[in-house]
């Protein structure tokens, strides 16, 4: 019988039950009446309780001051109540207790309509915390931060009192490896600085619909191997000390809505600084607006050479294919290209709209490009045939060309410069 098992094993089993089922185990026996209170993991959702007082009462029992056992994981979801939501004392006491019980994984998500909770000061000096996820709360202006074991931080719609607060919070995590920032900010912030000697993965997702934010982001993380940016607010990005094997995923229009010559000219310094900071990336994913912006920039200034890049994933509008050779010219050692074209299936392009330039054959096509994967929604367009012909006729060592539809039987009649090339229909 399960009751004959030792308490630690029973607690482990109970930790996999939903909270509403967990509480009902109290009626099984006298021994089980308080056993659930000693679980090492708890997921507490205010929606499971009839009112605010019942929710707080339940949490207070679990975080009793006499508790001596450790708490490994605590997930807390707080949704708005009409009464009591503006009193954060219960949240402070729970997190204080969790810190004392050597919490390792903490996830707090608050959705009250009129109140933003501040995280208690005890959180900033938790010596055992390994994983932290915060959603719709405020980081306090803590003068002292010490999080020696924290490896993962996810921040969603988190507010901070000043721009130095988040910088200090991140830089005081000596073993931090992963940081995700989603819609965080401060209406008075100008520059967001992310400085870390241990950070390996960084994702920034900030859109105008989320909140007002800074105009500049500075990233200095010498061990960074993955950087994802989806930001249509910030006007300037400075990336320092990026690893030579880093992967980059960017959707970054530098705060521009239009890409006319005057608008792009106003961002030439910002684009130049950003491109110089990412020269060592080996794997780049670039999205529609960013590709268009960089190509518009190339008409004003020469693109730098991405000598370390071996893989490129580009999503672009078919109208922008004319810039592809220019962009590829800046990737002399490219081995793999994934090309995704988006647009209206009924679009027809004039001869001027798609120019691959018979005289321009990028260096990578002659010396390094081995794999091309074309994913395009258009059916039977002459322009698509031009695109495929361009790669088949000019890629000297191409090994495989992959297409996502089966209407290109004419491709077999196109002469190939590479004798090793395969044409694969998906």
UniProtKB/Swiss-Prot annotation:
Pfam family, any one: LRR_At5g56370
Residue ranges annotated for the FBD domain, each copy included: 353-405
Superkingdom classification of source: Eukaryota
SUPFAM superfamilies the UniProt entry points to: F-box domain, RNI-like
Domain F-box: 1-45
InterPro entries (alphabetical): F-box-like_dom_sf, F-box_AtFBL13-like, F-box_dom, FBD, FBL13/AtMIF1-like, LRR_dom_sf, LRR_FXL15/At3g58940/PEG3-like
Protein name, per record: Putative FBD-associated F-box protein At5g53635
Species name: Arabidopsis thaliana (Mouse-ear cress)
